[in-house]
Each structure stands twice: as C-alpha cells, then as structure tokens.
C-alpha cells in the first residue's frame, strides 16, 4: 500500500496505523447532460470554467469534467478502509463502500466518523485528499443540509493546521506546484495500482449508462 511505503519504509513516520481511515471518492456531474441544466446553471458553469477551458472549447463540451467541482457534481461512492490488529500476526485491512443515493451515503459516512473515528488521534488519509476528497465531501454535505462531522469541519484552518494525511502532499516534499497521480506514483514505486479497472474520466459515462 502506498501510504505504508511512504510513511513506514521511506520516511520512517511514526503513526498508530489503526487510527487512520483511508478514503477515496468517486464523483460525476450532477446531471448527465449540459443541456438538461437550468439556463442559470449553464451560465454559472460557463463562468466557473472559463479559465480552465481553451478558447475553442465550449462549456457544453467541457461539461464532462463537471464532476470535479462540488457545485456541479455529486458523490456516487465513498470507499473507506482501516487496519485492525495492525501490530500482530492477525493484522487485517477492512474495506467498506458507501454508494447509491448521495444524501444517504453522506449520512452513513458521517455516522462512521462520529461513531468510530471521532477522537483527536484519528486521522483521514487520501491521495490529494486535502485539496479534493475532504473539501468535496464537506461541500456536498453543506449543499445537502447535513451538518459537518468534526473531522471535516476544517473551516478557517491553514493547510499546516489540518492533521489529516495526504499521500500526494507527502510526495511533494514542499514542491506545491508538483502533481503526481496515484497511478503514476504506485507505478514508479512498484506498488499494484488500485486504479487499473476504470479511469476517473470514464466514471461518469459508466455511471449514467447503468443508471
């Protein structure tokens, strides 16, 4: 696992690994087609993306990427994992996925945090989690009128005040312009990639074909 390689083998960071909740989210545009957005929402999306789009690409053509913004996307799955009995021979890694209706999966994920990962020593971990997964979940909770669990209530905190772990941040070594995908990082470190079955860019098309 990438996290263990970076923290335990490479950087010798001392952590109680049973206190870490690993997570990854999958997101898609809130509505399948740009043309089905309200007129106001179409204008807002055009304004939101005007600096990301090339001049010859319209907002409608760019809409397939709408899932990366919490204001225009929804979460369709939150997958989590955690270690049990890490320090002995009975060590295991348990995995659970919350999927389906977004409101329900957000509530279920919140209950997991509040009931099992609510202490100061508990940490969240993701790849690019601090800039994507953690704030995305928080924003979607607010949009859906779900009060934030303490672990995601990061309002007003500076980056260095957020205790959660980000494997991409570990790899940056202070170079904040550097982006490395999870697939690339696992490849160069010789770790089996968890992202081989489907790429992030294909999630929306697969989701809407099946739903």
Where are these regions (language model features)?
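Conserved RNase H-like, two-metal-ion catalytic cores of nucleic-acid enzymes
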Residues: 11-111, 115
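Metal-dependent phosphoesterase core characteristic of DEDDh/y 3'-5' exonuclease domains
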Residues: 13-18, 73-100, 116-211
């Amino acid at each position: 696992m990438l996290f263990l390689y970076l923290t335990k083998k490479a950087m010798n960071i001392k952590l109680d690994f049973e206190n870490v909740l690993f997570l990854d989210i999958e997101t898609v545009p809130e509505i399948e087609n740009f043309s089905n957005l309200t007129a106001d929402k179409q204008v807002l999306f055009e304004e939101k993306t005007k600096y990301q789009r090339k001049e010859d690409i319209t907002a409608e053509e760019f809409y397939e990427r709408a899932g990366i913004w919490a204001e225009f996307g929804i979460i369709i799955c939150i997958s989590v994992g955690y270690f049990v009995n890490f320090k002995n021979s009975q060590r295991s890694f348990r995995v659970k996925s919350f999927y389906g209706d977004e409101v329900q999966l957000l509530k279920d994920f919140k209950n997991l945090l509040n009931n099992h990962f609510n202490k100061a020593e508990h940490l969240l971990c993701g790849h690019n989690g601090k800039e994507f997964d953690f704030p995305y979940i928080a924003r979607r909770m607010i949009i859906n009128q779900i009060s934030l669990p303490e672990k995601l209530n990061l309002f007003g905190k500076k980056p260095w005040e957020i205790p959660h772990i980000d494997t991409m941040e570990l790899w940056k070594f202070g170079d904040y312009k550097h982006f490395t995908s999870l697939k690339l990082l696992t490849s160069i470190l010789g770790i089996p990639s968890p992202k081989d079955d489907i790429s992030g860019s294909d999630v929306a098309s697969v989701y809407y074909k099946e739903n």
